[in-house]
């Protein structure tokens, strides 16, 4: 399984001849190396409904006939826009032809904001994502605060790599993320959701230096690891 980071919270997984994107915020993302028009994808996994995570989902899904796996309310909202979806909810799992997906808890919000009409649409509970293929497991925490049930996620799953937000302000910051890394017990931890905007500026190298009992890995946009 090849796992690539593409800035903010964008993660690409290549496994069994399939390409999976998590939270494909590409257009307007100053930290990504990808252009939406160049992306080929078979499935899109969404952690929640905020614009910096849904991103280019509708365009990508329609162009590639890709299925979008998302929390129920968000999946329903996207299906009304002509997107092929597979709704799930926290605690649920499903075996797809590209791998197994399970949604975990996350402490955050989830909504679609229409600036023009000044409306906010609730898009369900936010989630973390466990993805398993080729006997390897990836944990994408989504946007979240630190929460004690991360210990349970670590106990129940043999996590090979965890992507954890460190930006603070909207999610947990580096200090909380160090504790999260300890609790989820991943072999490798990659920081995400930082330096995209001034309010979430952090030093990822300082973060990985503080990690214990795991390998910390800072990935620049376009860099990858193989599990």
Swiss-Prot record:
InterPro entries with a match to the protein in the record: Metallo-B-lactamas, RibonucZ/Hydroxyglut_hydro, UPF0173, UPF0173_UPF0282_UlaG_hydrolase
Keywords from the UniProt entry: Hydrolase
Cited Pfam families: Lactamase_B_2
Molecular function terms from GO: hydrolase activity
Signal peptide feature range: none
Superkingdom in the source lineage: Bacteria
NCBIfam families noted in UniProt: PRK00685.1
Similarity comment: Belongs to the UPF0173 family.
Official protein name in the record: UPF0173 metal-dependent hydrolase BCE_4747
